[in-house]
């Protein structure tokens, strides 16, 4: 087994990142989606299949209904998830899973039954020789070269703040909100409606997601930016739709991600903001470790990729933290792959060899072995 490269798969709500241990970046990055034809005749004659996965589903989205098997970080549809894993191994990476140890990632607070089901599918359906299931935020911390810190991980389906001390997460202080990339896309569609642009179908929502990812940024001072947007056209940017029409996006560019900082004010949602989530998680920890956490706030995940988000989070946390503490927010440029890179690094360590759940372990103990071996 030692001579077979480990496969590292980070299953996000929105995007699968997969590749090989020891490499710097994932080889395969594709949407965690399955598309099925809205009506059968729509695809007749076009090498029609009954379903499409990942990029292919994305390309044909106009005639498909799009399904996401992972919702808010948790796998909800196991049959579809199995298809995504199958696609990951055989199509994207072109490997035989029974020849490679596999590291899978999971959301913090993942239900125990889910961890067991993942384990069962890997050993029984894919016959992997060895498996490890790692918490996403812990891997992000490793990829930042730290073992202590608090990770603010915002993906497509869920946002978590996870305090970690000496490599172990502190479960009672983990916080989560169901406010992440997908919600920002929906909110962006709402803001565009104000301008008379209507996007509703799953295909149109993919256009909105693209607008959000390409044009949005976080304002350091929201009120000042709003005032400026009324007085000038500084923030206006054009976006060309697939049909060639050009639309102009103005203050929606920073109003959209402001939702993360002011969920109630921006969209009437009684949720914690990301600064409250981070601060509260730190306050839940032992007083002796708080300083270390404040000095190592790590941003991770695609929804933290907005320009200006690190500076704004720093400003918000500094306003709440004790004045004697030097708060530090770390936002590495490729943080959307931080989880995957952490998995690649961890599995490359010689000390990791003893961590695997082997096929023998599984045959002897069943799926519950995952709770003992993967802390």
Curated annotation (Swiss-Prot):
For whether the record's keyword set contains Cytoplasm, the answer is: yes
InterPro entries noted in UniProt: Actin, Actin/actin-like_CS, Actin_CS, ATPase_NBD
At the top of the EC hierarchy, this enzyme's class is: hydrolase
One GO cellular component assignment for this chain's record is: cytoskeleton
Protein's name in the database? Actin, cytoplasmic
| Gene that this sequence comes from | MIC-ACT-1
Native species? Sterkiella nova (Ciliate)
One MF annotation (Gene Ontology) recorded for this entry? ATP binding
Query: Which catalysed reactions does the entry list for this protein?
Result: ATP + H2O = ADP + phosphate + H(+)
Its keywords, alphabetically, are: ATP-binding, Cytoplasm, Cytoskeleton, Hydrolase, Nucleotide-binding
* Gene3D superfamilies reported for this sequence: 3.30.420.40, Actin, Chain A, domain 4
What's the EC number here? 3.6.4.-
Coiled-coil spans in chain: none
Q: What is its main location?
A: cytoplasm
Q: Which family does the record claim for this protein?
A: Belongs to the actin family.
Transmembrane segments in this chain: where?
none
Q: What does this protein do?
A: Actins are highly conserved proteins that are involved in various types of cell motility and are ubiquitously expressed in all eukaryotic cells.
Q: State where the protein is found.
A: Cytoplasm, Cytoskeleton
